[in-house]
């Protein structure tokens, strides 16, 4: 009887260790304090999607005090837009730091959508080391349909 109790206790401890080790990391979403409404929207949309996927996340205005091992996603608009088309974005990842740089606020939104799609498809935070994308046509989604029907 005592042996059976020890086996149950050992199994319980092993299960707790496995579950504790499987905890998803906290994700810090960092954006400038003076971020535009579109960048704020992108950050909130990303935060909700991460939480829906089981991650805890927090929105910050800088990386001060963050541990270098914490996962961080930085959202920003490009200061120099020469390399990006309108509504374009670049995602770059080094270690635990992923930066989404949009040519404009819409580019940041589309970059965050790319991250959200990645989390949904791959169930992880291993984002591409480098990805740049921009639309062929600036108008996307429902706007194109509206233009077709209002002409």
Residue ranges and their predicted role:
Residues 2-11:
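Bacterial N-terminal signal peptides that target proteins for export
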Residues 20-21:
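C-terminal motif of bacterial Sec signal peptides marking the signal peptidase cleavage site
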Residues 24-39, 70-76:
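Short hydrophobic beta-strand segments
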Residues 26, 34, 42-45, 49, ...:
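Feature activates predominantly on carbohydrate-active enzymes
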Residues 43-62:
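N-terminal segment of the mature soluble domain
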Residues 58-84:
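Short, well-ordered secondary-structure micro-motifs within conserved domains or adaptor modules
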């Amino acid at each position: 009887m005592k042996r059976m109790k020890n086996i149950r206790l050992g199994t319980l401890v092993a299960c707790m260790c496995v579950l504790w080790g499987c905890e998803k990391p906290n994700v810090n979403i960092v954006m400038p304090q003076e971020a535009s409404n579109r960048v704020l929207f992108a950050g909130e949309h990303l935060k909700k999607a991460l939480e829906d996927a089981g991650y805890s996340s927090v929105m910050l205005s800088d990386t001060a005090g963050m541990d270098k091992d914490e996962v961080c996603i930085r959202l920003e608009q490009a200061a120099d837009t020469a390399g990006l088309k309108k509504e374009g974005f670049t995602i770059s990842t080094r270690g635990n730091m992923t930066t989404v740089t949009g040519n404009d606020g819409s580019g940041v939104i589309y970059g965050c959508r790319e991250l959200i799609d990645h989390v949904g498809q791959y169930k992880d935070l291993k984002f591409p080391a480098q990805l740049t994308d921009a639309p062929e046509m600036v108008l996307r989604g429902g706007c194109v349909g509206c233009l077709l029907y209002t002409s």
